[in-house]
Amino acid sequence: MSEAPKKRWYVVQAFSGFEGRVAQSLREHIKMHGMEEYFGEVLVPTEEVVEMRAGQRRKSERKFFPGYVLVQMIMNDESWHLVRSVPRVMGFIGGTSDRPAPISDKEADAILNRLEKASEAPRPRTMYEVGEVVRVNEGPFADFNGTVEEVDYEKSRLKVSVSIFGRATPVELEFGQVEKLD
């Protein structure tokens, strides 16, 4: 008695910007061809990010791997052809063109854990670190450079030490009022 093959995770390259549509089309193709037994999840790994725009907190989604869709599947000729027949699919990543290699269980677990963490709390679009130098681009301290002393991601605010007349002055600013220096 042989064991049924295990579904493994494969990385499918899609046209950039069409990952969601490719995932949806793939799900529809699987149903249409009655191949549900060969496929598990079809994912476009994203995280919710928060950014300040015009003084407003805005939530948006950022893709972990732009241009890629993760597909849990049993690889055989039929499932391979089904994935390749979906519009805007460029191919599989890893292995050879006719025999793709799955990602390791360790890599798959790392991605799935990252997805779980991302669903818990939205992250800011821009990450700031204590000690980092930023430029103030709004308000009375516009065009001054300062050093980040504290970061409050909950409120999207920073405490920045700005040098005014040779003295370091702590200033509370919103994320949208500063920009990172390269």
UniProtKB/Swiss-Prot annotation:
Coiled coil: none annotated. One of its GO terms (biological process) is transcription antitermination. Residues 130-161 form the KOW domain. It comes from the Bacteria. GO terms for cellular component: cytosol. Keywords: Transcription, Transcription antitermination, Transcription regulation, Transcription termination. InterPro entries: KOW (IPR005824), NGN (IPR047050), NGN-like_dom (IPR006645), NGN_dom_sf (IPR036735), NusG-like (IPR043425), Rib_uL2_dom2 (IPR014722), Transcrpt_antiterm_NusG (IPR001062), Transcrpt_antiterm_NusG_bac_CS (IPR015869). Participates in transcription elongation, termination and antitermination. Belongs to the NusG family. This is Transcription termination/antitermination protein NusG. The lineage of its organism: Bacteria, Pseudomonadati, Pseudomonadota, Gammaproteobacteria, Vibrionales. The gene is nusG.
